[in-house]
């Protein structure tokens, strides 16, 4: 048998993810760019796992249902953009959507890795209520709070120090993880983020039969991408003939 699990990634696309407080290869990047680089490496290492992708902002969308096709999941992550799901942060709804999708499976180990840089400011369900339901359904949640604690900016009055992560609700993220039997991680820079994903690699796997692990190319429809394309076309100005 081959080890594996059902693992859903939930990535915050709210407006604050454009904050440029990370550095990768001596280049300053925003939080989503750093997430894409590190999570891409994580996805490539998940041989034998079924992976899924949820993108959330004001609303939560299932961008990739569970699949062995990690290449497609990675591509969809790389194509994501800040603001596509709205400017606010629906953490509870993202957890609820993961519960709904992962609950379709009964015997597999279920894991959600949720990354955010803020607090729950939108959605229909509170994060703690969603976390309790997740625990009841056997879904383990690992939460990652992303963002530096200090940023130095140049202003007309000289250098100014600020905390770009002032809105991060670490206490809620800790409670979400604790309720579901997971763990909370704090990623203040790209190195810490990479170490977190290495720790996640050590999650205990479930056993699967080899016959269930044949490579599959995902052919599912991408509803969020289609909806965004349609919205873009509708916003194009009409020209008079």
Features from the language model and the residues they span:
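…and closely analogous acidic/polar surface helices at protein-protein or active-site interfaces
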Residues: 1-5, 17-50, 67-74
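Short acidic, Gly/Ser-rich segments with clustered Asp/Glu that frequently serve as metal-coordination loops
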Residues: 13-22, 119-122
